[in-house]
Regions:
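Compact, glycine-rich, soluble single-domain proteins
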Residues: 2-63
Length: 63
C-alpha cells in the first residue's frame, strides 16, 4: 500500500495526526486526512507544509 504518516508541526513539536493516511485534502478551512478504512480527521486551520513521498510523510502546519 501507499499510505503515509501525517504530522502536525508546531514550532519544534511534531505530533502524529494519522499513521496510515491514504488521502489528504486541503480546503479553505484546513486539512481532511482519511485512511484506507474511511476514518477521517479534520484539522481545522491546518495547511500543507511538505509532502515527502519517498519517506511516506506528510507535514501540516497551522495557518
Amino acid at each position: 500500500m501507499c499510505e503515509s504518516a501525517v504530522y502536525l508541526i508546531r514550532g519544534e513539536v511534531k505530533s502524529l495526526v494519522m499513521q496510515d493516511a491514504a488521502k489528504v485534502v486541503i480546503t479553505d478551512e484546513g486539512a481532511v486526512v482519511v485512511n484506507s478504512l474511511g476514518e477521517r480527521k479534520v484539522m481545522k486551520d491546518a495547511d500543507l507544509l511538505e509532502a515527502n513521498l519517498i519517506r511516506h510523510e506528510i507535514l501540516l502546519r497551522p495557518k
